[in-house]
Amino acid sequence: MKKILIVLLAMVLLLAGCGKNGTSSPQSPSDESVTDQQEPSSSETEISSEDHAIPGTYTVPDGWEKSEKHSTDSQIFYIEVGHENDEKPDNISIHVGKNKYSLDEHEQFRDAIVKQILMQLDGIEAQLNGDGTYTEQGDLLYIFTIDEGDIVTTQYYTVKDYGFCLIQLTNFSGSETTEQAARDMVDSFVWDTEG
């Protein structure tokens, strides 16, 4: 328990840099860097909200496919091609939800997520780390990594007014390419325009 409290304190101090104070917040990518992004390669698949209930578009990296066996209308799972029948395949899921926080209240949203994760980790030997940054699209992003030794779960929360997109990587193999695939999905996510 003492280890979790120390990690939590370090995480709160680390995440404090994502506040409203312009001198300590992470730098948002410039408009130029957002517009200079590469289009998905022919081997990648761009998914739009017309394909599912997720209100946005994103790119599924080459070598990954939808897991029909695990996906639902509100949460889509992806696994590496050829691993559908593995006992514990690395997987990436995407889910969009609503919350009671405006974008200006993102720190309260972050604190609620930390509290929820700590409740879920009660009694589990794990290390929790957190970070705050921006996606390549310029959206606020909170990243929480839960290391249980043999399983590493990384949660990427892309934040907007009264909502979020959670892309979660569950990494059983320790593969760095799996981590990169999840981050590529996060950075490619674009909210549908509301109107």
Feature-to-residue mapping (PLM):
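Bacterial N-terminal signal peptides that target proteins for export
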Residues: 1-5
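N-terminal targeting sequences that direct proteins away from the cytosol to non-cytosolic compartments
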Residues: 6-8, 18-77, 170-195
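Repetitive helical segments and hydrophobic/amphipathic motifs
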Residues: 11-12
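Secretory pathway targeting signatures of secreted, lumenal, and periplasmic proteins
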Residues: 57-103
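Soluble non-cytosolic domains of exported or imported proteins
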Residues: 103-108, 176-180
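Signature of long, low-cysteine stretches enriched in small and polar/charged residues
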Residues: 112-158
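Short, well-structured beta-strand
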Residues: 139-195
